[in-house]
Amino acid sequence: LNNLKGKVESRWSVVDIVIVNVGDGRSVSDALPSDEQWKSTWNSNFESALQTARTFLPILEESQGVLLFVSSIAGIEAFGAPTDYSTAKTAIIALAKNMARKLAPSVRVNVIAPGNVYFKGGSWDGKIKQDKKDVDEIIKSTVPMNRFATPQEIADSAVFLCSDRANFITGATLVIDGGQTVGVL
């Protein structure tokens, strides 16, 4: 990460936005995964986000910038996502809220929490190839908008939270899920 930080600083004179989008959803469905599995998921989803924030925070404090974490609706509600993954994504939201309170007004810290996002090569693409009818039924029964989010919709939300139009927003988690969490929050 320090190598990446050095490259970023040498390329741009001012860095005022850092988006922390790290981790993966690969895990197991066990209620309580093994220690080895837990550590692997925790490290790839939470610890990597924490270390990225820690590495780039001095730059953002200097520029009075924005730190945006990408979490998941799995960090907000139990939807059947793996326990270790959900826990790590919840921890990201808690980290961001605490950082936002302590860093305001110099650095804004927010989170986006996407729901189901479709893109070629993604996990939903593979599931659709296996059983499109089943996936269609899952989406129609769980997402009031009856569709997947697009990567562009997630990107647009990130751009907004990092823009001057969101200058008074810090410590927030923007849920982008087509209404999937409407009845559970």
Locate each region found by the language model:
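Short C-terminal tail/terminal secondary-structure segment
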Residues: 77, 158-159, 170-185
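Residue(s) in the substrate-gating loop at a strand-loop-helix junction
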Residues: 72
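Active-site loop-to-helix junction immediately N-terminal to the catalytic Tyr of the SDR YXXXK motif
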Residues: 33, 78-86, 98-99
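Substrate-binding pocket helix/loop in short-chain dehydrogenase/reductase
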Residues: 29-42, 139
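Active-site helix of classical SDR
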Residues: 53, 88, 96
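Short, small/polar-rich loop/turn modules that mediate ligand/substrate recognition or access, typified
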Residues: 104-108, 169-171
